[in-house]
Amino acid sequence: MGGLTYTLVVNGSVYGSQSARSAYQFAQAVIEQGHTLVSVFFYQDGVTNGTALSVPANDEFDLTKAWQGLAKEHDVRLETCVAAALRRGIISEDEATQHGLTQNNLAEGFVQAGLGSLAEAMLTQDRVVQF
């Protein structure tokens, strides 16, 4: 039997709670066990995982870079909810242009998506796990 497909939903901020770090550790375990992590959907305060402007202290784990590395190595989509991101100042280049802003700060490897993307994942993945 082949492995299962997973999507993770991360609601916790990049450094404000243990939620996002736990999700990252779970993502690693899913992949190590031979399953496929299709996407990670960052929602509510979880969208802060996708900021390019987070600079942790030298002795702290850089969770944004960790997500980027995992996505690149294992072809995982990193999606921030566009509405939640805009409310929290996480802006993609496209959204900046659309709203007449001169700056953007969505980290490389992350994309902004709507709730339809999460709904599709719920219908098509074997497992959706929320953190």
From Swiss-Prot:
Write out the annotated subcellular location. Answer: Cytoplasm
BP-aspect Gene Ontology terms: tRNA wobble position uridine thiolation
A GO CC annotation given for this chain = sulfurtransferase complex
| Active-site residues per Swiss-Prot or TrEMBL entry | C81 (cysteine persulfide intermediate)
Q: Which SUPFAM superfamilies match?
A: DsrEFH-like
Q: Which domain of life is it from?
A: Bacteria
The top EC class is transferase
Q: Does the keyword Transferase apply?
A: yes
Report a single Gene Ontology molecular function: sulfur carrier activity
Keywords per UniProt: Cytoplasm, Transferase
**What InterPro entries does this protein map onto?**
DsrEFH-like, Sulphur_relay_DsrE/F-like, Sulphur_relay_TusD/DsrE
Q: Does the keyword Cytoplasm apply?
A: yes
Q: What is its EC number?
A: 2.8.1.-
Role noted for this protein: Could be part of a sulfur-relay system.
Family membership noted in the UniProt record? Belongs to the DsrE/TusD family.
Name the UniProt record assigns to this protein: Sulfurtransferase TusD homolog
**Where does this protein come from, organism-wise?**
Vibrio parahaemolyticus serotype O3:K6 (strain RIMD 2210633)
Q: What is the lineage of its organism?
A: Bacteria, Pseudomonadati, Pseudomonadota, Gammaproteobacteria, Vibrionales
